[in-house]
Regions:
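Negatively charged, low-complexity tracts enriched in Asp/Glu with abundant Ser/Thr
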Residues: 1-49
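A structural detector for beta-sheet-dominated domains
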Residues: 5-9, 43-45, 79, 104, ...
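Ampiphathic alpha-helical segments that act as solvent-exposed interaction surfaces
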Residues: 19, 80-114
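Short, low-complexity, polar/charged sequence segments that are solvent-exposed and flexible
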Residues: 23-27, 61, 94-99
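Intrinsically disordered, low-complexity regulatory segments enriched in Ser/Thr/Pro
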Residues: 57-92
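Short, highly charged C-terminal tails/helix-capping segments
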Residues: 107-135
Length: 135
């Protein structure tokens, strides 16, 4: 999971809208889903450019936003296309490439990005959705 800490003056909702726009318009992602609470999930594109960010993982998910006095904190994760593809390599690939995407496009909005240290815990959360943050 990626924990993205925004600069204090950055509005998290506007930031999420910018990410949506950039992923859909510039990266060719498709299948935008917005759930009842405003979270969103993207289906990765079939082309190389879209797929390169996620390898075998097919979905990017914004899981939660926390508002703190030092700036909003957003949590991102992935939902693999097949549970057998839940490997440390897939998560490492996601962390590396999605972090690069965020920093290359939105460095001026971001204070810090923290990568989940416990990949096994993240895999457990995906396999057991009731353990997700915010649930």
């Amino acid at each position: 999971m990626l924990k993205v800490i925004l600069k204090k003056e950055i509005d998290s909702e506007k930031f999420l809208q910018e990410i949506k726009k950039r992923l859909i318009e510039d990266k060719g992602y498709k299948g935008l889903i917005i759930d009842g609470e405003g979270d969103f999930t993207y289906r990765a594109a079939d082309d190389y450019e879209g797929a390169c960010y996620f390898s075998y993982a097919s979905w990017l998910s914004h899981r939660k936003t926390e508002q703190t006095e030092n700036g909003d904190v957003l949590y991102f994760g992935i939902i693999p296309s097949k549970k057998k593809r839940l490997t440390k390599e897939v998560y490492s690939f996601f962390h590396t490439h999605f972090s690069r995407f965020l920093l290359s496009c939105f460095d001026h909005h971001i204070k810090d990005i923290v990568i989940s240290a416990d990949i096994n815990q993240e895999i457990d959360i995906i396999l057991n959705p009731q353990k997700r943050i915010g649930d």
